[in-house]
């Protein structure tokens, strides 16, 4: 394979630029040419495809977002869009493509694979909800950003004896809420993967103030309900604290990526190039126990799939993604309502 392309699709995530940089420079080191596709699958279909060189990705590793830009393009789910995209790739002499994005992006890569066009997926999403990998590109930065802002909210909540409900992104996954909540010393963490009792939530808040707490923070994953709705539910259940709601929202997607995200993205990007060089498409790159692994993208893009690693190093797809609820149990132990 002598010429490949790279695109970013779906929601942006810190570290995408680092992944693009790794794809470009690793490919060049292997004697391959690299093209960039602007605005994901939309740019593929419309032919917004252009050559990249080492200078094209200079000074990008520290930048958030994606300089290739991103777009959601549901038309690519249709056969006509897929065939137009492949036609444009072949028109530019491209033999394989690296797709950086979330599960929707993986579905697009799966369609390319079904049509016999080699595609390799990289997990780029802050939600950490992609199967086939322990961590996704952007997750670590999103957690760090959430923790920074939770720390700031702790300052103001302590000054006014307030309870804060802080909504964080994650779609149907509670990973950001769990990791940031524990790191910020949240009093309660509410995630989609675990049922909660609103009366118990309110009771915990009351017990905390009765024990001498001056403020409380509840971290809420957006997949449960909105922060405003959760606050209304608390009030309906009898909460009488001075309650405020903050939604961190898209703030978690921005900013310079952490060192961990930069390294992870660099490793994954280089690994993807190696797979394409070997003529191996139809795969998604992941990290498992700090080692690079690849999984069949046809399995990972299916609803409710999850990988497990066998003793032979093979990937088995079987169960849906689940946040590590051991973290939820840990937070209940650490957020003792009798302590400040």
From Swiss-Prot:
This is ATP-dependent 6-phosphofructokinase. Pathway: Carbohydrate degradation; glycolysis; D-glyceraldehyde 3-phosphate and glycerone phosphate from D-glucose: step 3/4. InterPro entries: ATP_PFK, ATP_PFK_prok-type, PFKA_ATP_prok, Phosphofructokinase_CS, Phosphofructokinase_dom, PKF_sf. The gene is pfkA. Substrate binds at residues 125-127, 162, 169-171, 222, 244, 250-253. Catalyzes the phosphorylation of D-fructose 6-phosphate to fructose 1,6-bisphosphate by ATP, the first committing step of glycolysis. Homotetramer. One of its GO terms (cellular component) is 6-phosphofructokinase complex. It comes from the Bacteria. HAMAP family: Phosphofructokinase_I_B1. Keywords: Allosteric enzyme, ATP-binding, Cytoplasm, Glycolysis, Kinase, Magnesium, Metal-binding, Nucleotide-binding, Transferase. The lineage of its organism: Bacteria, Bacillati, Bacillota, Bacilli, Lactobacillales. The keyword Transferase applies. It is an enzyme of class 2 (transferase). PROSITE patterns: PHOSPHOFRUCTOKINASE (PS00433). It catalyses: beta-D-fructose 6-phosphate + ATP = beta-D-fructose 1,6-bisphosphate + ADP + H(+). GO terms for molecular function: 6-phosphofructokinase activity; AMP binding; ATP binding; fructose-6-phosphate binding; identical protein binding; metal ion binding; monosaccharide binding. Its cofactor is Mg(2+). One of its GO terms (biological process) is canonical glycolysis. It is found in: Cytoplasm. Mg(2+) binds at residue 103. Its EC number is 2.7.1.11. ATP binds at residues 11, 72-73, 102-105. The active site is at 127 (proton acceptor). Belongs to the phosphofructokinase type A (PFKA) family. ATP-dependent PFK group I subfamily. Prokaryotic clade 'B1' sub-subfamily. The keyword Transcription does not apply. ADP binds at residues 21-25, 154, 185-187, 213-215. Allosterically activated by ADP and other diphosphonucleosides, and allosterically inhibited by phosphoenolpyruvate.
């Amino acid at each position: 394979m002598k010429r490949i392309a790279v695109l970013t699709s779906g929601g942006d995530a810190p570290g995408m630029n680092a992944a693009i940089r790794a794809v470009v420079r690793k490919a060049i080191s292997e004697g391959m040419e690299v093209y960039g596709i602007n605005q994901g699958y939309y740019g593929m279909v419309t032919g917004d495809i252009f050559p990249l060189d080492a200078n094209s990705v200079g000074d990008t590793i520290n930048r958030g977002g994606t300089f290739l830009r991103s777009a959601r393009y549901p038309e690519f789910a249709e056969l006509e869009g897929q065939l137009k995209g492949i036609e444009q790739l072949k028109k530019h002499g491209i033999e394989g493509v690296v797709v950086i994005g979330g599960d929707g992006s993986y579905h697009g890569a799966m369609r390319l694979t079904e049509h016999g066009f080699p595609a390799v997926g990289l997990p780029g999403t802050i939600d950490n909800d992609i199967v086939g990998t322990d961590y996704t590109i952007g997750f670590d930065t999103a957690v760090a950003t959430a923790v920074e802002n939770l720390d700031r909210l702790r300052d103001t909540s302590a000054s006014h004896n307030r309870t804060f409900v802080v909504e964080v992104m994650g779609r149907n996954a509670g990973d950001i809420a769990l990791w940031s909540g524990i790191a910020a010393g949240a009093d309660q963490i509410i995630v989609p993967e675990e049922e909660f009792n609103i009366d118990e939530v309110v009771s915990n808040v009351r017990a905390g103030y009765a024990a001498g707490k001056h403020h409380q923070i509840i971290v809420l994953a957006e997949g449960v309900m909105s922060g405003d709705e959760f606050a209304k539910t608390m009030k309906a259940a009898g909460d009488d604290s001075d309650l405020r709601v903050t939604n961190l929202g898209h703030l978690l997607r921005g900013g310079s990526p952490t060192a961990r995200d930069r390294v992870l993205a660099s490793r994954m990007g280089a690994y993807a190039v190696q797979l394409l060089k070997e003529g191996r498409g139809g795969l998604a790159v992941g990290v498992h126990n700090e080692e690079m692994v690849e999984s069949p993208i046809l399995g990972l893009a299916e609803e409710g799939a999850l990988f497990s690693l066998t003793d032979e190093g093979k990937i088995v797809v079987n169960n849906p993604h689940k946040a590590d609820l051991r973290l939820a149990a840990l937070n209940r132990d650490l957020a003792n309502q009798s302590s400040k």
